[in-house]
Curated annotation (Swiss-Prot):
CDD domains: MFS_GLUT_Class2. Glycans are attached at N50. Residues 1-17, 91-97, 149-160, 213-276, 334-341, 394-411, 460-501 are cytoplasmic. This is Solute carrier family 2, facilitated glucose transporter member 5. It is a multi-pass membrane protein. Pfam families: Sugar_tr. One of its GO terms (molecular function) is fructose transmembrane transporter activity. It comes from Mus musculus.
Length: 501
């Protein structure tokens, strides 16, 4: 009886905890690390670009050409992320979730070696190519890790474990900021080491992850290997009797037989998945277009205007990164208590208020002496709000609102939206800042407001529900009679259990 109760509630076993940590550290950590790794040593890297150009051509590089090369260095990362997102469906269907993560380490170890040797080889081209490769790595990992952990976790731990990838992204950013202090590796000799360290987590994952189970859902639904799926569940749960969870996966398999293989194109045309698709696109776009990258872009300027010495800005920036890590840890503990929907509403609302107040503070900072301090508070409040909901929850929800056959295609679309939005903000924000000045954040406040309204009106709470139950909630919105109806019929008489939800 006790074992049956354990199966219904689920526990954080040692195997599940280690699988989560190894997957997140080996993949998500690299994403965060490579976001921040080039920021601190940028002036030394650009000097290296100039010196290399001079050695080849016996003249200094033109300012425009240097700016173009550095823009390529930075923008190759989100562009690679977009390419990586397009590869997700094929990789997870052919290699499995765990197999895709192991394969993905190629896109980390190879560029780590190239970046580490770039100074010796006198080639800035190696850095630009490597930034594309680590971007591909981040694009794959940002989609596959939440999918893998969401399929490993029991439903009562799915939210907490689903936030862990975002935690390791923030830890990766913080570690890059700390290693990127001038006194450590952000200097003339240390920057190749700083860039090359991204290969260390990949190497550890390559050594350790093979000893942990593949996703039981992938094994049963896609590989049709019930024995392997049951063994994987028993290893993850720590007990032999997993028949209730196996039965739930079988029901999901039965529900999906009518749909068959779902490609990206088919996902766009299926009425039974329409509102799941729209919700995913809104959340992934809202996550990036809410201004998170712009806040970090503007942060140094805000700190300087508040009187922080230029040499000390790096420490304040690292402090902001520490706040981000702390709030993401807090989210792990409250996501199963407060739910996904509530955290999204609170997070986007907090970002909305922070953007509005920041706009006023920036507009008045030359008039009122203490306004720069309000700006600093706004940056910190924004980081807190984004860490509570907009950063960690959207990727978790993709796992929850789609079933096994549609999940890879959903992650391809969601990941593509994420990286294109990221790239767009990075590309156009400097021009928005030039045109609107302190009023730039009105645009992000508007996006936060619209996203909050959408979440309130459309996105359901998924806490504590099975994947089938969550998809049944959407049947009424989609005006279909079942999760995957054989014919996309208009909504008729729905089962009473669905109407109650």
């Amino acid at each position: 009886m006790e074992e049956k109760h354990q199966e219904e509630t689920g526990e954080l076993t040692l195997v599940l905890a280690l699988a989560t940590l190894i997957a997140a550290f080996g993949s998500s950590f690299q994403y965060g690390y490579n976001v921040a790794a080039v920021n601190s040593p940028s002036e030394f890297m650009q000097q290296f670009y100039n010196d290399t150009y001079y050695d080849r051509n016996e003249e200094n590089i033109e300012s425009f050409t240097l700016t173009l090369l550095w823009s390529l260095t930075v923008s190759m990362f989100p562009f690679g992320g977009f390419i990586g997102s397009l590869m997700v469906g094929t990789l997870v269907n052919k290699l499995g979730r765990k197999g895709a993560l192991l394969f993905n380490n190629i896109f980390s170890i190879l560029p780590a070696i190239l970046m580490g040797c770039s100074q010796i080889a006198q080639s800035f081209e190696l850095i630009i190519i490597s930034r594309l490769l680590v971007g591909i790595c981040a694009g794959i990992s940002s989609n596959v890790v939440p999918m893998y952990l969401g399929e490993l976790a029991p439903k009562n731990l799915r939210g907490a474990l689903g936030v862990v990838p975002q935690l390791f992204i923030t830890v990766g950013i913080l570690v890059a900021q700390l290693f990127g202090l001038r006194s450590l590796l952000a200097n003339e000799d240390g920057w190749p080491v700083l860039l090359g360290l991204t290969g260390v987590p990949a190497g550890l994952q390559l050594l350790l992850l093979p000893f942990f189970p593949e996703s039981p859902r992938y094994l049963l639904i896609q590989k049709k290997d019930e024995a392997a799926a049951e063994r994987a569940l028993q290893t993850l749960r720590g007990w032999k009797d997993v028949h209730l969870e196996m039965e739930e996966i079988r029901k999901e398999d039965e529900a999906e037989k009518a749909a068959g293989f779902i490609s990206v194109w088919k996902l766009f045309t299926m009425q039974s998945l329409r509102w799941q698709l729209i919700s995913m696109i809104v959340l992934m776009a809202g996550q990036q277009l809410s201004g998170v990258n712009a806040i970090y872009y503007y942060a140094d300027q805000i700190y300087l205007s508040a009187g922080v010495k230029s040499d000390d800005v790096q420490y304040v920036t690292a402090g902001t990164g520490a706040v981000n890590v702390f709030m993401t840890i807090l989210t792990i503990f409250v996501v199963e208590l407060w739910g996904r929907r509530f955290l999204l509403l609170v997070g986007f609302s907090t970002c909305l208020i922070a953007c509005l107040v920041l706009t006023a503070a920036l507009a008045l900072q030359n008039t009122i002496s203490w306004m720069p301090y309000i700006s600093i508070v706004c940056v910190i409040v924004y980081v807190i709000g984004h860490a509570l909901g907009p950063s960690p929850i959207p990727a978790l929800l993709i796992t929850e609102i789609f079933l096994q056959s549609s999940r890879p295609a959903a992650y391809m679309i969601g990941g593509s939206v994420h990286w294109l939005s990221n790239f767009t903000v990075g590309l156009i924000f400097p021009f928005i800042q030039m045109g609107l000045g302190p009023y730039s954040f009105i645009i992000f406040a508007t996006i936060c407001f619209l996203t909050t309204i959408y979440i309130f009106m459309v996105v359901p709470e998924t806490k504590g529900r099975t994947f089938i139950e969550i998809n049944q909630i959407f049947t009424m919105k989609n005006k279909v009679s079942d999760v995957y109806p054989k014919k996309e019929e208009e909504l008729g008489a729905l089962p009473h259990a669905i109407l109650e939800q």
